[in-house]
Amino acid sequence: MCLLYDGFFSFVIVFGGLSLFILGYTSGFDLEKMIGKPEESNTGVSGEAETVLPEISGKATFLLACGSDDGQTLHLAALVGADMEEQSFSIYMLDPDARVNAGLRSVSLQEHYRLGGSGELKLAAEELTGIKVDRYLYTAEKGFKTVLRTLGNGLVLNVPSKIDYRGEDFTLRLQPGEQTLNADTLLKWVKYTGGGRQAQQDRQAQMLCAAFDQLITIDHARDAEKLFKTIINEVDSDISMLDFTNHRVALEVLARSGQRKASARVASAAALARE
Protein backbone atom coordinates (compact mmCIF):
# COMPACT_ATOMS: atom_id res chain seq x y z
CA MET A 1 0.00 0.00 0.00
CA CYS A 2 1.30 3.43 -0.89
CA LEU A 3 1.42 5.46 2.34
CA LEU A 4 2.60 8.92 3.28
CA TYR A 5 6.13 8.91 4.68
CA ASP A 6 6.68 11.02 7.79
CA GLY A 7 3.11 12.24 7.35
CA PHE A 8 4.08 14.95 4.85
CA PHE A 9 4.06 15.51 1.11
CA SER A 10 4.07 18.28 -1.38
CA PHE A 11 2.13 17.69 -4.53
CA VAL A 12 1.03 20.32 -7.01
CA ILE A 13 -1.05 18.97 -9.98
CA VAL A 14 -3.35 19.61 -12.76
CA PHE A 15 -6.23 17.43 -13.68
CA GLY A 16 -4.89 16.44 -16.77
CA GLY A 17 -2.50 18.43 -14.88
CA LEU A 18 -4.85 20.16 -12.53
CA SER A 19 -4.39 18.28 -9.29
CA LEU A 20 -0.73 19.16 -9.03
CA PHE A 21 -1.67 22.65 -8.01
CA ILE A 22 -4.61 21.91 -5.77
CA LEU A 23 -3.45 18.85 -3.85
CA GLY A 24 -0.05 20.26 -3.04
CA TYR A 25 -1.26 23.69 -2.13
CA THR A 26 -4.07 22.46 0.12
CA SER A 27 -2.60 19.33 1.67
CA GLY A 28 -2.74 20.86 5.12
CA PHE A 29 0.70 19.47 5.96
CA ASP A 30 3.66 21.52 7.19
CA LEU A 31 5.96 21.83 4.21
CA GLU A 32 8.94 23.06 6.21
CA LYS A 33 8.87 19.93 8.38
CA MET A 34 8.99 17.80 5.26
CA ILE A 35 11.58 19.52 3.11
CA GLY A 36 13.16 22.11 5.38
CA LYS A 37 13.78 25.71 4.46
CA PRO A 38 15.89 26.64 1.42
CA GLU A 39 19.54 26.86 2.32
CA GLU A 40 21.84 29.69 1.34
CA SER A 41 25.38 29.17 0.15
CA ASN A 42 28.05 31.52 -1.11
CA THR A 43 28.97 31.30 -4.75
CA GLY A 44 32.64 31.90 -4.00
CA VAL A 45 32.78 34.36 -6.89
CA SER A 46 30.52 37.27 -6.12
CA GLY A 47 29.99 36.45 -2.49
CA GLU A 48 26.23 36.81 -2.96
CA ALA A 49 23.91 34.25 -1.42
CA GLU A 50 22.57 31.64 -3.80
CA THR A 51 19.37 29.74 -3.07
CA VAL A 52 19.80 25.97 -3.01
CA LEU A 53 16.69 23.97 -3.82
CA PRO A 54 15.80 21.78 -0.83
CA GLU A 55 15.20 18.06 -1.04
CA ILE A 56 11.58 16.94 -1.12
CA SER A 57 10.28 13.55 -0.03
CA GLY A 58 7.11 11.63 0.71
CA LYS A 59 4.66 9.39 -1.11
CA ALA A 60 0.92 9.58 -1.58
CA THR A 61 -1.82 8.19 -3.80
CA PHE A 62 -4.54 10.32 -5.35
CA LEU A 63 -7.78 9.48 -7.12
CA LEU A 64 -8.48 11.58 -10.20
CA ALA A 65 -11.80 11.36 -12.02
CA CYS A 66 -13.74 13.17 -14.71
CA GLY A 67 -17.40 12.73 -15.60
CA SER A 68 -20.35 14.22 -17.40
CA ASP A 69 -21.91 17.46 -16.23
CA ASP A 70 -25.10 15.62 -15.22
CA GLY A 71 -23.16 13.20 -13.00
CA GLN A 72 -24.47 10.12 -14.80
CA THR A 73 -21.34 9.03 -16.68
CA LEU A 74 -17.79 8.53 -15.43
CA HIS A 75 -15.44 9.17 -18.34
CA LEU A 76 -12.12 8.69 -16.56
CA ALA A 77 -10.86 7.33 -13.25
CA ALA A 78 -7.23 6.85 -12.27
CA LEU A 79 -4.98 6.45 -9.27
CA VAL A 80 -1.85 8.59 -9.31
CA GLY A 81 1.12 7.62 -7.17
CA ALA A 82 3.27 10.61 -6.29
CA ASP A 83 6.84 9.98 -5.14
CA MET A 84 8.44 13.27 -4.25
CA GLU A 85 11.87 11.83 -3.48
CA GLU A 86 12.02 10.26 -6.94
CA GLN A 87 10.15 13.25 -8.41
CA SER A 88 7.92 10.89 -10.34
CA PHE A 89 4.23 10.26 -10.97
CA SER A 90 2.83 6.80 -11.75
CA ILE A 91 -0.65 6.37 -13.20
CA TYR A 92 -2.94 3.35 -12.87
CA MET A 93 -6.14 3.54 -14.89
CA LEU A 94 -9.39 2.27 -13.36
CA ASP A 95 -12.26 0.78 -15.36
CA PRO A 96 -15.47 2.71 -14.58
CA ASP A 97 -17.42 -0.49 -15.30
CA ALA A 98 -15.47 -2.57 -12.76
CA ARG A 99 -17.83 -4.03 -10.16
CA VAL A 100 -16.92 -3.33 -6.55
CA ASN A 101 -18.50 -4.23 -3.22
CA ALA A 102 -18.12 -1.06 -1.17
CA GLY A 103 -20.29 0.40 1.54
CA LEU A 104 -23.79 -0.99 1.14
CA ARG A 105 -23.58 -1.56 -2.60
CA SER A 106 -22.06 -4.02 -5.05
CA VAL A 107 -22.08 -2.03 -8.26
CA SER A 108 -19.69 -0.54 -10.82
CA LEU A 109 -17.34 2.33 -10.00
CA GLN A 110 -19.54 4.51 -12.18
CA GLU A 111 -22.63 3.57 -10.16
CA HIS A 112 -20.81 4.17 -6.89
CA TYR A 113 -20.12 7.71 -8.06
CA ARG A 114 -23.62 8.25 -9.44
CA LEU A 115 -25.29 7.04 -6.24
CA GLY A 116 -22.81 8.16 -3.59
CA GLY A 117 -20.66 10.89 -5.07
CA SER A 118 -16.89 11.32 -4.94
CA GLY A 119 -16.56 10.06 -1.38
CA GLU A 120 -18.09 6.71 -2.26
CA LEU A 121 -16.04 6.55 -5.46
CA LYS A 122 -12.90 6.94 -3.34
CA LEU A 123 -14.03 4.12 -1.02
CA ALA A 124 -14.82 1.88 -4.00
CA ALA A 125 -11.42 2.56 -5.58
CA GLU A 126 -9.73 1.57 -2.32
CA GLU A 127 -11.75 -1.65 -2.13
CA LEU A 128 -11.02 -2.47 -5.76
CA THR A 129 -7.26 -1.94 -5.58
CA GLY A 130 -6.33 -2.43 -1.92
CA ILE A 131 -4.52 0.93 -2.03
CA LYS A 132 -5.25 3.74 0.42
CA VAL A 133 -6.34 6.89 -1.39
CA ASP A 134 -5.01 9.96 0.39
CA ARG A 135 -7.04 12.55 -1.51
CA TYR A 136 -9.58 12.56 -4.34
CA LEU A 137 -10.28 15.13 -7.01
CA TYR A 138 -13.21 15.01 -9.43
CA THR A 139 -14.14 17.40 -12.20
CA ALA A 140 -17.09 17.50 -14.54
CA GLU A 141 -16.70 18.34 -18.23
CA LYS A 142 -17.18 22.09 -17.81
CA GLY A 143 -14.61 22.28 -15.01
CA PHE A 144 -12.16 20.10 -16.92
CA LYS A 145 -12.09 22.54 -19.83
CA THR A 146 -11.95 25.60 -17.58
CA VAL A 147 -8.97 24.24 -15.67
CA LEU A 148 -7.01 23.37 -18.81
CA ARG A 149 -7.73 26.79 -20.29
CA THR A 150 -6.51 28.38 -17.09
CA LEU A 151 -3.28 26.39 -17.32
CA GLY A 152 -2.57 27.19 -20.95
CA ASN A 153 -5.28 25.47 -22.97
CA GLY A 154 -3.13 22.79 -24.53
CA LEU A 155 -1.11 19.59 -24.21
CA VAL A 156 1.23 18.04 -26.76
CA LEU A 157 0.12 14.47 -27.45
CA ASN A 158 1.01 11.83 -30.00
CA VAL A 159 -2.04 10.69 -31.97
CA PRO A 160 -1.19 7.09 -32.94
CA SER A 161 -3.63 6.81 -35.84
CA LYS A 162 -6.23 8.82 -37.71
CA ILE A 163 -9.45 9.52 -35.84
CA ASP A 164 -12.59 10.49 -37.74
CA TYR A 165 -15.50 10.17 -35.34
CA ARG A 166 -18.96 11.72 -35.60
CA GLY A 167 -21.25 11.06 -32.68
CA GLU A 168 -24.45 12.47 -31.25
CA ASP A 169 -22.69 14.75 -28.76
CA PHE A 170 -19.34 15.52 -30.39
CA THR A 171 -17.12 15.13 -33.44
CA LEU A 172 -13.42 14.28 -33.21
CA ARG A 173 -11.14 14.44 -36.23
CA LEU A 174 -7.38 14.08 -35.80
CA GLN A 175 -4.51 13.16 -38.08
CA PRO A 176 -1.74 10.90 -36.75
CA GLY A 177 1.36 12.45 -35.25
CA GLU A 178 2.50 14.76 -32.47
CA GLN A 179 0.33 17.83 -32.03
CA THR A 180 -1.09 20.25 -29.48
CA LEU A 181 -4.68 19.56 -28.43
CA ASN A 182 -6.68 22.34 -26.80
CA ALA A 183 -9.07 21.95 -23.87
CA ASP A 184 -12.14 21.21 -26.00
CA THR A 185 -10.32 18.56 -28.02
CA LEU A 186 -8.74 17.04 -24.91
CA LEU A 187 -12.19 16.48 -23.40
CA LYS A 188 -13.25 14.72 -26.60
CA TRP A 189 -10.01 12.71 -26.40
CA VAL A 190 -11.01 11.58 -22.90
CA LYS A 191 -14.58 10.70 -23.90
CA TYR A 192 -13.82 9.01 -27.24
CA THR A 193 -14.38 5.24 -26.94
CA GLY A 194 -13.01 4.13 -30.31
CA GLY A 195 -11.08 0.85 -30.14
CA GLY A 196 -12.74 -0.21 -26.89
CA ARG A 197 -11.97 0.44 -23.24
CA GLN A 198 -8.27 -0.47 -23.44
CA ALA A 199 -7.62 1.95 -26.30
CA GLN A 200 -9.58 4.66 -24.50
CA GLN A 201 -7.54 4.18 -21.32
CA ASP A 202 -4.32 4.27 -23.35
CA ARG A 203 -5.33 7.70 -24.66
CA GLN A 204 -6.38 8.91 -21.22
CA ALA A 205 -3.14 7.73 -19.62
CA GLN A 206 -1.09 9.51 -22.29
CA MET A 207 -2.99 12.72 -21.55
CA LEU A 208 -2.46 12.45 -17.78
CA CYS A 209 1.26 11.76 -18.19
CA ALA A 210 1.56 14.74 -20.54
CA ALA A 211 -0.23 16.96 -18.04
CA PHE A 212 2.16 16.10 -15.23
CA ASP A 213 5.19 16.47 -17.47
CA GLN A 214 4.17 19.66 -19.30
CA LEU A 215 2.17 21.73 -16.81
CA ILE A 216 4.55 21.92 -13.87
CA THR A 217 6.43 24.99 -15.05
CA ILE A 218 8.27 27.92 -13.52
CA ASP A 219 5.61 30.30 -14.82
CA HIS A 220 2.86 28.26 -13.18
CA ALA A 221 4.85 28.12 -9.95
CA ARG A 222 5.15 31.89 -10.03
CA ASP A 223 1.39 32.33 -10.54
CA ALA A 224 0.31 29.42 -8.34
CA GLU A 225 -1.83 31.38 -5.90
CA LYS A 226 -3.87 33.00 -8.65
CA LEU A 227 -4.21 29.68 -10.48
CA PHE A 228 -5.31 27.93 -7.30
CA LYS A 229 -8.09 30.42 -6.65
CA THR A 230 -9.46 29.85 -10.14
CA ILE A 231 -9.08 26.07 -10.19
CA ILE A 232 -10.42 25.22 -6.73
CA ASN A 233 -13.92 26.37 -7.70
CA GLU A 234 -14.03 24.00 -10.67
CA VAL A 235 -13.53 20.69 -8.86
CA ASP A 236 -15.10 18.40 -6.27
CA SER A 237 -12.54 17.28 -3.70
CA ASP A 238 -12.07 16.29 -0.07
CA ILE A 239 -9.68 19.23 0.20
CA SER A 240 -11.09 22.37 1.79
CA MET A 241 -10.13 26.01 1.48
CA LEU A 242 -9.06 25.84 5.12
CA ASP A 243 -6.29 23.49 4.01
CA PHE A 244 -4.81 26.12 1.75
CA THR A 245 -1.27 27.00 2.62
CA ASN A 246 1.64 28.34 0.70
CA HIS A 247 3.66 25.36 -0.52
CA ARG A 248 5.40 27.33 -3.21
CA VAL A 249 8.82 25.91 -2.32
CA ALA A 250 7.90 22.38 -3.38
CA LEU A 251 6.37 23.57 -6.63
CA GLU A 252 9.50 25.59 -7.32
CA VAL A 253 11.60 22.47 -6.72
CA LEU A 254 9.55 20.42 -9.19
CA ALA A 255 9.44 23.22 -11.74
CA ARG A 256 13.17 23.96 -11.62
CA SER A 257 14.54 20.49 -11.00
CA GLY A 258 16.45 18.71 -13.73
CA GLN A 259 15.91 15.39 -11.96
CA ARG A 260 12.21 14.85 -12.65
CA LYS A 261 11.35 11.53 -14.23
CA ALA A 262 8.86 11.20 -17.05
CA SER A 263 5.42 10.23 -15.78
CA ALA A 264 4.48 6.66 -16.63
CA ARG A 265 1.48 4.35 -16.65
CA VAL A 266 1.66 1.16 -14.61
CA ALA A 267 -0.21 -1.99 -15.57
CA SER A 268 -1.56 -3.05 -12.18
CA ALA A 269 -2.50 -1.84 -8.72
CA ALA A 270 0.28 -4.03 -7.33
CA ALA A 271 2.80 -2.20 -9.52
CA LEU A 272 1.49 1.15 -8.31
CA ALA A 273 1.80 0.03 -4.69
CA ARG A 274 5.45 -0.87 -5.29
CA GLU A 275 6.32 2.50 -6.81
PLM features: what roles do these ranges have?
Residues 2-275:
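Non-catalytic, solvent-exposed segments at the cell envelope interface
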